[in-house]
Amino acid sequence: MHTGGETSACKPSSVRLAPSFSFHAAGLQMAAQMPHSHQYSDRRQPNISDQQVSALSYSDQIQQPLTNQVMPDIVMLQRRMPQTFRDPATAPLRKLSVDLIKTYKHINEVYYAKKKRRHQQGQGDDSSHKKERKVYNDGYDDDNYDYIVKNGEKWMDRYEIDSLIGKGSFGQVVKAYDRVEQEWVAIKIIKNKKAFLNQAQIEVRLLELMNKHDTEMKYYIVHLKRHFMFRNHLCLVFEMLSYNLYDLLRNTNFRGVSLNLTRKFAQQMCTALLFLATPELSIIHCDLKPENILLCNPKRSAIKIVDFGSSCQLGQRIYQYIQSRFYRSPEVLLGMPYDLAIDMWSLGCILVEMHTGEPLFSGANEVDQMNKIVEVLGIPPAHILDQAPKARKFFEKLPDGTWSLKKTKDGKREYKPPGTRKLHNILGVETGGPGGRRAGESGHTVADYLKFKDLILRMLDYDPKTRIQPYYALQHSFFKKTADEGTNTSNSVSTSPAMEQSQSSGTTSSTSSSSGGSSGTSNSGRARSDPTHQHRHSGGHFAAAVQAMDCETHSPQVRQQFPAPLGWSGTEAPTQVTVETHPVQETTFHVAPQQNALHHHHGNSSHHHHHHHHHHHHHGQQALGNRTRPRVYNSPTNSSSTQDSMEVGHSHHSMTSLSSSTTSSSTSSSSTGNQGNQAYQNRPVAANTLDFGQNGAMDVNLTVYSNPRQETGIAGHPTYQFSANTGPAHYMTEGHLTMRQGADREESPMTGVCVQQSPVASS
């Protein structure tokens, strides 16, 4: 220990010692009061002379390093302590708990304020604001790849854009006026994106193929007039149509349409499916639902199928997740291979919904959908579930080899035992129709309902191989001879004032002569969609509301008798069944004997085509100045990748198809009365049913009419070109549309009723 007079061995300038620990406590208190410094190295303690250091005890000197170490840590902690504290009202915990509603309101205010400001900037003329926004496709597109529609815009000196009428995942649909053809059209504008373009090109190819085989436009498929590229968007020009069957149901307050009108829709749909099943087409629609079936005229029952955006040809199936859920077939739910039979399942669901007003199977998800199907139809056959990849998603196999429904995970939904929710009761076969609303009405007898129920059950067969096919469905006894019926929903919409005001109106129609010419029209003011090709009519004026949308009549009065289909064996003569597909047109079919219904036919068989020419009476061009702009349809599609065409080279069953029109179709027997369909009703289903999966499609002889004005390219295909600067190539001209003739027609109370279009869903 050094004495007081001794000096330290170290240089005084190098010593920076703190006082003793007891003294430093006061020093810390003083340090806390001093202003904080950003550089701790600038904060120094007072210098201590060598004499003071020598006077310290040894124990105090030992504690000095510890004091030097503790002091910086405490000072650092003091510096980290906030000098001011947050207002408790603004704390996140409070905002997300006690003040949660207030927080959400503030978020909404900020969000909508920004949205409103952007909207105002978009409409303003200030160029400075427009420069701030990102430009897509030279300013023609929005950030969703959709074309920015401007009302009144003129495209290629031909199309005048009127308004946006529909929007979906595929793009948009606009109403436009074609100055060249002088008619209203619906233009489907595809998104400016490769995936949507590829899928739309498939739709174009299928529509061209169908229109090529249906030049008379009598198989209820929407007519694609032409297509072109405009500002990097593929545009499809369709004929003008009216609203869809879902809109019609909504107009009945979801009470459903009459059984007679349901029959009209059913027969047209079966004819369309028969057309799609021809071997040259073999097209699966894949998305049949009320929204995709459109009325040609709001006053009439003629319909057309639209939206082939998710369609494919047999053998080119690339998707497993298809069809809207309510109308999804069991084989699709179970992950099995599918064919054209899935569209027949969808049709069965649609027909029940059109009459009852409610979906038959309204599942919230796939499991719920299957459970609701089982409620009505029971457990699917074991041989189907044994082969289904997704069977155990819905069912479980018991030790004895049978299958039963799995219990739902949530346990909230309670279902009726399998097969106990009878279609008999859903349709109200013996109780006056659905909800008893049809009791006492003409055409709604128990016998009528029994025929309807039998047809629906055949359409809803679990096994796609034994599910009824369009050819046999058209021969079902449900399709009896009926007069034309408009979309009259007077018995269903008692609460609609607009409907009640229209119920008192009525019209009569003149019938055409037996020569096949169109000699008159109804005085209801129905006219062709082409204003330059008006038929002479006996009324005096045309109703402006439907002048641009009449597309119901496709063929004149013709009575056709087709030869018996090739491939029938045996000596028993086939039964002749006369099918009246038009009020003035009849077609005779040869129904196969029961035991020899259809056999595979190999080799080259000759096809017989019957051509009937139209004779029209014309007068001058109709003025367009006062034409009312009708509503048209929305047609959403599903995007998918491109598919290549594939020929179906399997053996087919040869038979003849209906020559049908958009008017009411009915089946009657020319030789056996009501027993004309006996050959079909008693046929052994399992033995004689066609297997679409193996044979491709039914070989149906369809009458094909050539179009002398159609330009063809290689292999007879229509020629067309894509151009962003020039007008579209006219590769598909309009087929002749004659005025539909018939007797005892009723003016529909739908006339003049503005029906709100259903929202477009992304399917």
Curated annotation (Swiss-Prot):
The keyword Transcription applies. Residues 502-525, 654-672 have a biased composition (Low complexity). Pfam families: Pkinase. It comes from the Eukaryota. Residues 595-625 are annotated as: Histidine-rich domain (HRD). The modification Phosphoserine is found at residues 14, 310, 529, 538, 748, 758. The modification Phosphothreonine is found at residue 402. Inhibited by RANBP9. Inhibited by harmine, leucettamine B and leucettine L41. CDD domains: PKc_DYRK1. One of its GO terms (molecular function) is tau protein binding. It is an enzyme of class 2 (transferase). Keywords: ATP-binding, Kinase, Nucleotide-binding, Nucleus, Phosphoprotein, Serine/threonine-protein kinase, Transcription, Transcription regulation, Transferase, Tyrosine-protein kinase. One of its GO terms (biological process) is peptidyl-tyrosine phosphorylation. The modification Phosphotyrosine is found at residues 111, 140, 145, 159, 177, 219, 319, 321, 449. It catalyses: L-seryl-[protein] + ATP = O-phospho-L-seryl-[protein] + ADP + H(+); L-threonyl-[protein] + ATP = O-phospho-L-threonyl-[protein] + ADP + H(+); L-tyrosyl-[protein] + ATP = O-phospho-L-tyrosyl-[protein] + ADP + H(+); [DNA-directed RNA polymerase] + ATP = phospho-[DNA-directed RNA polymerase] + ADP + H(+). Residues 33-56, 115-136, 408-442, 485-540, 596-679, 744-763 are annotated as: Disordered. Residues 159-479 form the Protein kinase domain. Can also autophosphorylate on serine and threonine residues (in vitro). Autophosphorylated on numerous tyrosine residues. Residues 598-620 have a biased composition (Basic residues). The polyhistidine repeats act as targeting signals to nuclear speckles. The histidine-rich domain (HRD) region is intrinsically disordered and promotes the formation of phase-separated liquid droplets that enhance its ability to phosphorylate the CTD (C-terminal domain) of the large subunit of RNA polymerase II (RNA Pol II). Dual-specificity kinase which possesses both serine/threonine and tyrosine kinase activities. Plays an important role in double-strand breaks (DSBs) repair following DNA damage. Mechanistically, phosphorylates RNF169 and increases its ability to block accumulation of TP53BP1 at the DSB sites thereby promoting homologous recombination repair (HRR). Interacts with RAD54L2/ARIP4. Interacts with CRY2. Interacts with RANBP9. Interacts with WDR68. Interacts with SIRT1. Belongs to the protein kinase superfamily. CMGC Ser/Thr protein kinase family. MNB/DYRK subfamily. This is Dual specificity tyrosine-phosphorylation-regulated kinase 1A. It comes from Rattus norvegicus. The gene is Dyrk1a.
